[in-house]
Amino acid sequence: MPNIDVLCHDGSPLGVTVKSIYGDEFRYGIGGSELALLTMCEAWTEQGHTVRLYNDPFELNASPFEQLPISAFNPQDNRDCLINFRSPNPLSIHAKGMHTWWSTDQYSQGDYRRFAPFMDKIVCISQHHADFFKKVYGIEKAFVVDIPIREKDFIDSENKVSIKNRLIFTSIPDRGLRNLLSIYPDLLREIPDISLVVTSDYRLWGASPQNEQYRIEWIKYMDTVQFRGALPRKKYMEELCKADLMVYPCVYPELFCISVAEAQWAGVYPITSSAGALKTTNMGTIIDADPNTNRKLYIDKTVEICNNQDNLANLRKVMQEKARERFSLERILTEWQTKVFN
């Protein structure tokens, strides 16, 4: 089995360990990119690869693979594959091993255009992401591999029963929570038994004054809305499996959107905008219209789906089957083996 070094450089991947996923450190959890990083490192280790992750971990020996300070990275160490994760790290340019850049962002530190020629392979996380690289940075050799679902986290939630017309919002608040607030009064009027749980806020990335601002805006609807904010992973899973729909009038050009992928895995039917990669990650209903100027489309489609529960049950079943094939860890490990390591 090839040995794999994963080198980080800046931003959200720094510090995180497998313990971070479950809120066992000082963070409430982690974002989708970090979740993918740790899940894949863990899975590669289970396959028999020797994995070293250089990301300045908050705690040593907190993951089933080795984690080290970035300063410990030696370009001349023997390795089969070097993965630059997220953003370019100049330490890697003349390092030993096959060079792969696993990008999960379109804007971060470093010169993408100048860095790309040093890479043997470039992995993007959606076609939208790869198209952006080509258009903005002139990077034409990138290919796409989905982010996997961390399947083991769903095992205890498999037999949960959803609550009729329960909506869930699990993404970053400023990517569409205010747009959902703008249509919620209409949804409440048309669907009297509707309810909503919000399970995300900025505490995933540390304290932020924006947390309370979003919570306050929903106060008048607290009879039907639970604004729980960032939750420990297990509690988040419980809320996800109680939901019927994820109405996400997103206004941010998502590069993948783990929130929508996890919702589909759990059988929560997504109704989203077509922003960024949502047009491919979402296998439910996509509304190709700006949520800021087309509120009625989002209202009407949500009401239509909620008012036909038999059809919704069928939509959820078909979508979940597709999600469990597409986002399975086994399939994505095979893609990495075929497209990258071979």
Give each language-model segment a name:
Residues R52-D120, C124-D131:
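Extended catalytic core of nucleotide-activated donor transferases of GT-like folds
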Residues G110-D111, K134-K135, F143-K164:
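Acidic anion/phosphate-binding donor-loop and adjacent secondary structure
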Residues E158-G176, L181, V197:
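Conserved donor-binding/catalytic core segment of Leloir-type glycosyltransferases
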Residues Q210-M237:
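Nucleotide-activated donor-binding/catalytic signature segment of Leloir-type glycosyltransferases, i.e.
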Residues C241-L255:
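Acidic donor-binding loop of glycosyltransferase active sites
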Residues Y269-T272:
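Short hydrophobic beta-strand element within catalytic cores of glycosyltransferases
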